């Protein structure tokens, strides 16, 4: 069976040569993509070097152990280290989500529950912004529809990363958040002290690096302008600065009203539209590939309830992974890492199982051939 690592080592070396060429950096988009792939392969190269180094040390210890008791004593620890290193390399070989290094557009929408749902949407927004800050990511509110009580009917947030490591990218951290988030608590409007259940929906899209990455024909767009409104629906602008863009072929609609100028709102709306169209393309690919859809937590139905936030018990529970903890106050303050880590672990486990099945099928086919 061919070595699955060698082609990746060759690719890493080739990328290193290309990135050293100043001409490559004249095309910022191409340089960014090459750099992202290079950073992804760095982990595989380092893991492979460690396996090779430990293999050499183990071979030397075995050969010289009969003459040197100290070297003989190193054999078992080296065997254990090598086993761990090989498993780490195997995990690195599991194909990453190619979008991990991308920035994201995150949307939070109030669901059933009226004012309480809108307030919870605001809680989720603050949680995500604090988590992003703690993760070294930058955030920008693109559009929002606030309510009179301080919540949001809907809000769109851009999250941007700066690390060259795809595993630390905005999409790598936020892609598991899409779905229905349920809250159980006593609403501020509840006079009887009864616990109510409401929900908010979260959509997460990888953002397009360059505008021309997604081909959008102007003939496919329907653009409407109107006056922006504030809490309660009252008009807050005397000019038609708000923009609504409809992508006719897909039916995707994006509205923007946060900026004061129509041009700024249009640019922001196109930014979100490109992200949605990129996600739409990926969903079509996933729909044609059942194995890919099954192996990724991020592709669960967005209408699925993924998490419950129980305030009376201070409990957070993720229904996909089984994660449960009684530190809801800390999670809402941005301590979301353990919750997301449980989704990453589940996704990685599924990918490893799929990799094992693929390897077994290839081996069986090779023996038959």
From Swiss-Prot:
For whether the record's keyword set contains Protein biosynthesis, the answer is yes
Coiled-coil positions: none
What keywords are assigned to this protein? Cytoplasm, Methylation, Protein biosynthesis
Localisation per UniProt entry: Cytoplasm
Record GO cellular component, one term: cytoplasm
Q: How is it modified after translation?
A: Methylated by PrmC. Methylation increases the termination efficiency of RF1.
Identification of the protein by name: Peptide chain release factor 1
Taxonomic placement: Bacteria, Bacillati, Actinomycetota, Actinomycetes, Micrococcales
């Amino acid at each position: 069976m061919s070595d699955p690592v060698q082609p990746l080592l060759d690719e890493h070396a080739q990328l290193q040569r290309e990135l050293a060429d100043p001409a490559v950096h004249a095309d910022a988009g191409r340089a960014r993509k090459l750099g992202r792939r290079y950073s992804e392969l760095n982990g595989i190269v380092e893991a492979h070097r460690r396996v090779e180094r430990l293999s050499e040390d183990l071979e030397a210890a075995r050969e010289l152990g009969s003459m040197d008791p100290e070297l003989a004593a190193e054999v078992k620890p080296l065997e254990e280290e090598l086993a761990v290193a090989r498993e780490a390399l195997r995990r690195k070989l599991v194909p990453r989500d190619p979008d991990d290094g991308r920035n994201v557009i995150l949307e939070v929408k109030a669901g059933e529950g009226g004012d309480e749902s809108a307030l919870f949407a605001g809680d989720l927004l603050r949680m995500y912004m604090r988590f992003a800050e703690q993760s070294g990511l930058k955030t920008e509110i693109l559009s929002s529809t606030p309510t009179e009580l301080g919540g949001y009917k809907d809000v769109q947030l851009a999250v941007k990363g700066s690390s060259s490591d795809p595993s630390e990218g905005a999409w790598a951290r936020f892609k598991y958040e899409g779905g229905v988030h349920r809250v159980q608590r006593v609403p501020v409007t509840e006079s009887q002290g009864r616990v109510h259940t409401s929900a908010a929906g979260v959509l997460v899209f990888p953002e397009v690096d360059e505008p021309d990455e997604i081909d959008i024909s102007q003939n496919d767009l329907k653009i409407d302008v109107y006056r922006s409104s504030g809490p309660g629906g009252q008009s807050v602008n005397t000019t038609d600065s708000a923009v609504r863009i409809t992508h006719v072929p897909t039916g995707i609609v994006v509205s923007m009203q946060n900026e004061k100028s129509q041009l700024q709102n249009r640019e922001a709306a196109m930014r979100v539209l490109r992200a949605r169209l990129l996600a739409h393309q990926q969903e079509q690919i996933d729909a044609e590939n059942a194995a890919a859809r099954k192996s990724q937590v991020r592709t669960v139905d967005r209408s699925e309830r993924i998490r419950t936030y129980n305030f009376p018990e201070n409990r957070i529970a993720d229904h996909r992974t089984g994660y449960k903890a009684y530190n809801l106050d800390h999670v809402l303050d941005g301590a979301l890492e353990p919750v997301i880590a449980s989704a990453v672990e589940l996704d990685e486990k599924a990918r490893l199982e799929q990799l094992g099945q693929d390897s077994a099928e290839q081996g069986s086919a090779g023996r038959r051939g």
